[in-house]
Swiss-Prot record:
Pfam families: Relaxase (PF03432). Residues 142-205 are annotated as: Disordered. It comes from Neisseria gonorrhoeae. Residues 155-174 have a biased composition (Polar residues). Plasmid pJD1 is the smallest of the gonococcal plasmids. Its function is unknown. The keyword Transcription regulation does not apply. This is Cryptic plasmid protein C. The gene is cppC. The keyword Secreted does not apply.
Length: 205
């Protein structure tokens, strides 16, 4: 599992809600898990702040997980990013997506503290990244989810998802070329034992 925060948050409430559920609330493989879409949209629309909402997702390599785990994860994640707040102080909408070949638990949070009406910033990269990363690592260990920090899953080259296809292919080709250069050739490997055998009678160690 990975935790992603999207670079969004400006504009009206209809944008994120329509994306998650479809304009007519008929998006395929989308399911409302928690919250009231219309209430969330209304809170976003009522905001006078430049960044009106925070959006992101918990993304899993697993195609599905038990329903009780989903709700436990949502509860735990809210406790992590809303530390010190009660549930009546914030609004958080959760929508499940499964249309990309993986499970995503998407969240949208109006950046408003409900009791005071003051600005709420649930995630600030510089201050909160370490805490959220620690939460993610703990959940992956606890539930056995696929872990992006597993060395076996690290790519030899990190590529931006939005690169043009031909650029991605070129980058992959370069990566494969360098990998071959780093690997000892069969000819060189075959020669090494002969050198040792040739030196064996000369007393060299």
């Amino acid at each position: 599992m990975i935790v992603q925060f999207f670079n969004r948050g400006k504009g009206g409430g209809s944008g994120p809600i329509d994306y998650l559920l479809g304009k007519d609330r008929d998006r395929e493989e989308a399911r409302l898990l928690r919250g009231d879409p219309e209430e969330t949209a209304a809170l976003i629309n009522s905001s006078d702040y430049a960044k009106k909402y925070t959006a992101g997702c918990l993304s899993f390599e697993e195609s599905n997980i038990p329903a009780e785990q989903k709700h436990a994860l949502m509860d735990s994640f809210e406790e992590c990013i809303f530390a010190g707040l009660d549930k009546d102080q914030y609004n958080c909408l959760w929508v499940e997506h499964r249309d990309k070949g993986r499970l995503e638990l998407n969240f949208v949070i109006p950046n408003i503290e409900l009791l005071s009406g003051k600005r709420l910033q649930p995630y600030y990269y510089a201050a909160d990244r370490g805490r959220v990363d620690a939460w993610r690592t703990m959940q992956n260990l606890t539930h056995g989810y696929s872990d992006p920090d597993d060395p076996a899953k690290r790519q030899s080259m990190t590529q931006a998802k939005d690169l043009p296809r031909n650029t991605q292919e070129a980058a992959q080709s370069i990566t494969e070329h360098h990998r071959r250069l780093r690997s000892p050739s069969p000819i060189r490997q075959a020669k090494k034992p002969r050198r040792r055998a040739g030196n064996a009678g000369k007393g060299r160690f």
